[in-house]
Amino acid sequence: MRMSVAAIVLSVIVGAGCSGPSSDVFGVDLYSSSCVHCHGGDLAGGIGPALGPGSGAATLTDQQIVDVIRIGPGAMTSFRDRFTQAQLDSLVEFLRAEQGS
């Protein structure tokens, strides 16, 4: 009986760890902390170009967006060493959701 209670408790703990926030929520957090200052809270642009629906960014492939973030063309800061691939994927997923694609 003791073993089955321990197994149930362990499975609940492990299961809870698997149900973290969606990558879209993670993407919005990354955008808010690293991108909003230049690209705006509504992705309409500002210091940096617009990223929302109908923008040039909306025509880029996912890989092109990742490359832009990593390289930081023009006046944009390079985020090459700041984001993991999983974080980049989450950020692209967030942008695509906001762009309606």
Residue positions per predicted region:
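Gly/Gly-Pro-rich "capping" loops immediately C-terminal to redox-active cysteine motifs
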Residues: 24-28, 32, 37-71
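Positively charged n-region of N-terminal signal peptides that target proteins for export
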Residues: 1-5
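Bacterial signal peptide processing site
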Residues: 17-21
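Bacterial N-terminal signal peptides
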Residues: 6-16
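C-terminal capping alpha-helices of c-type cytochrome domains
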Residues: 69, 81-101
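Surface-exposed loop and edge beta-strand positions of immunoglobulin-like domains
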Residues: 41, 79-80
